[in-house]
Amino acid sequence: MLKTTLLFFVTALCEIIGCFLPWLWIKRGASVWWLLPAAASLALFVWLLTLHPAASGRVYAAYGGVYVCTALLWLRVVDGVRLTVYDWCGALIALCGMLIIVVGWGRT
């Protein structure tokens, strides 16, 4: 379970970075060269999703829970926004959903 969660976390970071770098280019006028590491990050994101033994749709659904939590961590650390009680509650619900799906992988 820990290995799966850690893999989902790294996958989420790759997706967020792959989307954040083009955002910097478009919104903040960063160099167009940031699109190269963005593309590499998104390619790594896709590859990491293939490392799970479950069906792709199940992997995507479970990954979503960890993505929500990782995005909120990004919001706090990178964007400097303080999380609200609604953020924490949403993260908890998302993680519970991920846990239910992952535990069920071996039972189907």
From Swiss-Prot:
The lineage of its organism: Bacteria, Pseudomonadati, Pseudomonadota, Gammaproteobacteria, Enterobacterales. Residues 27-30, 82-84 are cytoplasmic. It is a multi-pass membrane protein. This is UPF0060 membrane protein YnfA. InterPro entries: UPF0060. Residues 1-5, 52-60, 106-108 are periplasmic. It is found in: Cell inner membrane. Belongs to the UPF0060 family. The chain crosses the membrane at residues 6-26, 31-51, 61-81, 85-105. It comes from the Bacteria. HAMAP family: UPF0060 (MF_00010). GO terms for cellular component: plasma membrane. Pfam families: UPF0060.
